[in-house]
């Protein structure tokens, strides 16, 4: 009938008719009861200018339940460089859970329980950082999906666990070349978490 989580980026917002189609799909999914996930994933080369990008990327925020941005996108989405302030602003605009990725430092999560830092994992070597943010968010959404909770039911402890899982996925992803081939399997992620817990 409808997906549990409906995920969208901003690339389909760059031009018509894709922009209107994206809004139609998001509104339809939300009306059907789907959780809306959004990763703006700003790519300057795909927009005519930054002002246009800001306008259209921000236009989707009011429909979103779960949102992931990088620390390089905070100012673009909120006019604030500080990750804590940016996350709080997005939450106040209606986003239930905001995750700001911080590269190797981990992620900052903001929700109804306030904000918390979730540190990253140590990596053996960095081969390729492409896909690190996507792999983090994929891992995070996997945990949201399997929790069977609505976004506003998630506790800070839940979110710390989900972000830790996402950080583990990302740490494995950057150790291999190629964003897609580098995506780890569940057993690898669980092993990475177990190793870090005992080290």
Describe every region a protein language model picked out.
Residues 4-11, 39-42, 72, 122, ...:
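Generic, low-specificity signal for short hydrophobic/alpha-helical stretches with a mild N-terminal bias
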Residues 5-8, 13-89, 95-96, 105-106:
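Conserved beta-alpha-beta core of the PfkB/ribokinase-like small-molecule kinase fold
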Residues 27-28, 79-199:
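Conserved phosphate-binding/catalytic region of the ribokinase-like
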